[in-house]
Amino acid sequence: MQCLDDKLGQRAKDIDRALPETRNAVISTTSDGTLSVVRAASDRDPGTFYLYDAAKQELSELGRARKGIDPKLLSEMRPIRFKARDGWEIPGYLTIPIGRPATKMPMLVVPHGGPYGPRDVWGYSDDVQFFASRGYAVLQIN
């Protein structure tokens, strides 16, 4: 990401450094720029909100988007690439049920329109996590 404002760019770097395994977005900032609300999300967390104090360079948790979801119990979404018969490399995401060996399990393949337009992205998905929790590997092909 390229920020046009050096202060905001540094703030984004500080937040990403403090929350390294999440996709982070500043969703609101005070008019003087000292406080920001940050949403951090991942493949296993639909969103946790933080207050970022720029003067102190501190994050404090405000709350979670879905309190009933324990990220430690959810499955990881891994980016993958494989070659098609015609030699084209196809990107996608593979979610293997947590705590299961990645062999001989049923798989749900989630196709969509394309190759341009709709696509899957790395992040939390209720549907993917539901099927993974029931023992299915989930393959999302872009």
Identify the residue ranges that each predicted region occupies.
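Structural motif
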Residues: 1-12, 44-51
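A short helix->beta-strand "capping" segment at the edge of beta-propeller domains
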Residues: 11-22, 77
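Serine-hydrolase catalytic core recognition
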Residues: 27-142
